[in-house]
């Protein structure tokens, strides 16, 4: 295969020039022209959107208030929160604004004022709540201290009661032991008429003396008699 044949196979455009395909060339030109026409043509929706944007910019410029207008409206708001329709029209005429624009400004200003009042009220309530919480903490601390003091007092009271019980128990035992001699010392003795006749004592007087004589006194009395030598006669009388 020669070189020219190879080039024709690789590059058919060289082998078949544009004159051989007139329809393809014409259709390509028409497509190019249609594409250019579409680019030049502007859709009505896009045009309306552009017009709306320009109009919106103008309206935004109209809505912006100058510093003097804002100050005047602020002063009017301090005097009266809500305006009637004639007053709105009057303010709009004085400031060179639309009555609807003045009404919207007052509506927004009332909303901001209400929001500010709510924030202030919330701050007051929160401060009061914090104060109550702090007071509650102090009261709880004081309650714990009082409970501790009460526990200490109860413990001290229990200790004192135990000491008093121990003291009372020891004293009662000692008293019981010492009461025996006392009761025995005051015990009576039996009247012996033999002794009364032996020593020549009257019966009534001797009975009265011996009735209130204790055992200790009686024993001492008998010892004295034995030492004086009278016991023999007494025992003889009993025997």
Swiss-Prot record:
Residues 107-168 form a coiled coil. Probable transcription factor. The keyword Protein transport does not apply. Residues 58-117 bind DNA. This is Homeobox-leucine zipper protein HOX12. The lineage of its organism: Eukaryota, Viridiplantae, Streptophyta, Embryophyta, Tracheophyta. Transmembrane segments: none annotated. SUPFAM superfamilies: Homeodomain-like. Pfam families: Homeodomain. It comes from Oryza sativa subsp. indica. Expressed in seedlings, roots, stems, leaf sheaths and panicles. InterPro entries: HD, HDZip_class_I_plant, Homeobox_CS, Homeodomain-like_sf, HTH_motif. Keywords: Coiled coil, DNA-binding, Homeobox, Nucleus, Transcription, Transcription regulation. GO terms for molecular function: DNA-binding transcription factor activity, RNA polymerase II-specific; sequence-specific DNA binding. It is found in: Nucleus. The keyword S-adenosyl-L-methionine does not apply. Belongs to the HD-ZIP homeobox family. Class I subfamily. Residues 22-65 are annotated as: Disordered. CDD domains: homeodomain (cd00086). GO terms for cellular component: nucleus. One of its GO terms (biological process) is positive regulation of DNA-templated transcription.
């Amino acid at each position: 295969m020669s070189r020219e044949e190879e080039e024709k196979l690789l590059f058919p455009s060289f082998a078949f020039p544009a004159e051989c395909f007139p329809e393809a060339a014409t259709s390509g030109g028409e497509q190019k022209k249609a594409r250019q026409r579409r680019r030049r043509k502007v859709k009505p929706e896009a045009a309306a959107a552009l017009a709306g944007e320009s109009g919106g910019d103008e309206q935004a410029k109209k809505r912006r208030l100058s510093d003097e207008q804002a100050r005047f409206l602020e002063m009017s708001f301090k005097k009266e929160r809500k305006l009637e329709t004639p007053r709105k029209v009057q303010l709009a005429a004085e400031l060179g604004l639309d009555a609807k624009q003045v009404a919207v400004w007052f509506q927004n200003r009332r909303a901001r004022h209400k929001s500010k009042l709510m924030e202030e009220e919330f701050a007051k309530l929160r401060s009061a709540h914090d104060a109550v919480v702090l007071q509650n903490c102090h009261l709880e601390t004081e309650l714990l201290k009082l409970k501790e003091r009460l526990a200490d007092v109860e413990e001290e009271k229990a200790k004192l009661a135990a000491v008093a019980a121990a003291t009372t128990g020891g004293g009662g035992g000692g008293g019981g032991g010492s009461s025996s001699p006392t009761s025995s010392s005051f015990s009576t003795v039996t009247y012996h008429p033999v002794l009364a006749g032996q020593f020549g004592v009257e019966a009534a007087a001797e009975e009265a003396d011996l009735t209130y004589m204790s055992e200790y006194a009686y024993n001492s009395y008998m010892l004295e008699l034995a030492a004086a030598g009278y016991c023999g006669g007494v025992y003889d009388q009993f025997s």
